[in-house]
């Protein structure tokens, strides 16, 4: 009897943890959309497509997923210098937006789950706080 109860306990624990992480991600994405609208949309556009050669796309962006830490650092501290996104070179400047670590996590979760992007590996405030210049 004990093995069955133990098995059921672990099974339902994993389901509960999975559901709460999914709910946390959904809430983060909703908050991130508002932050994106306030701080990012003027350059990267409502569609996340950016402006070719000027403002890199966030929609279906290979850079976001291949360079997660650099993407977070760019939002947190600003970005300058050449980057390559979807095979196209960009060499502009993005000023830091003055966002808190939790706001950066939220906007990253929104960006990496919008416009054809899909990321179940949630960006957290703790992860952002560990990113240094």
Where are each of the predicted segments found?
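Electrostatic cytochrome c docking/interface patches
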Residues: 19-35, 50, 54, 130
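Axial heme c-ligation environment in periplasmic c-type cytochrome domains
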Residues: 52-59, 80-132
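A contiguous binding-surface segment within folded domains or other stable secondary-structure elements
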Residues: 26-29, 42-81
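Conserved Rossmann-like nucleotide-binding pocket used by diverse enzymes
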Residues: 15, 36, 95
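The canonical Cys-X-X-Cys-His
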Residues: 32, 36-46, 107, 111
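Alpha-helix boundary/capping residues
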Residues: 11-13, 39, 78, 111-114
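Bacterial Sec-dependent N-terminal signal peptides
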Residues: 1-31
